[in-house]
UniProtKB/Swiss-Prot annotation:
Keywords: Early protein, Host cytoplasm, Host endoplasmic reticulum, Host membrane, Membrane, Transmembrane, Transmembrane helix, Virion
Stated name of the protein: Protein OPG096
Signal peptide, first to last residue: none
Pfam families, alphabetized: Chordopox_L2
Keyword Transmembrane helix appears in the UniProt entry: yes
Subcellular location as annotated: Virion membrane; Host cytoplasm; Host endoplasmic reticulum membrane
Topology class, membrane: Multi-pass membrane protein
Function: Early protein involved in virion morphogenesis. Participates in the formation and elongation of crescent-shaped membrane precursors of immature virions in cytoplasmic factories.
GO cellular component terms given for this protein: host cell endoplasmic reticulum membrane; membrane; virion membrane
Oligomeric and partner information: Interacts with OPG158.
Transmembrane spans: 39-59, 67-87
Taxonomic source organism: Variola virus (isolate Human/India/Ind3/1967) (VARV)
């Protein structure tokens, strides 16, 4: 159990270091642009990071649960066919 706790502590420390690095890069990009464009650059970077995170979680979800997702898709298709052709 102690090994897992140590590993989690290492992950938290690495995430904090990564976040500081990303903030440093974003800060550098913001100050290269005119002041009027800084909020737009900040918004663009935040949207880009959000899309990357959503993509990573979607790939993980599909790769780990593709059988259940295929069964769910088959159920939806069969219910749709039942609704349109039988009723």
């Amino acid at each position: 159990m102690e090994v897992i706790a140590d590993r989690l502590d290492d992950i938290v420390k690495q995430n904090i270091a990564d976040e500081k690095f990303v903030d440093f890069v974003i800060h550098g990009l913001e100050h290269q642009c005119p002041a009027i464009l800084r909020p737009l650059i900040r918004l663009f970077i935040d949207i880009l990071l959000f899309v990357i995170v959503i993509y990573i979680f979607t790939v993980r979800l599909v790769s780990r649960n593709y059988q259940m997702l295929l069964a769910l898709l088959a159920l939806v298709i069969s219910l749709t066919i039942f609704y349109y052709f039988i009723l």
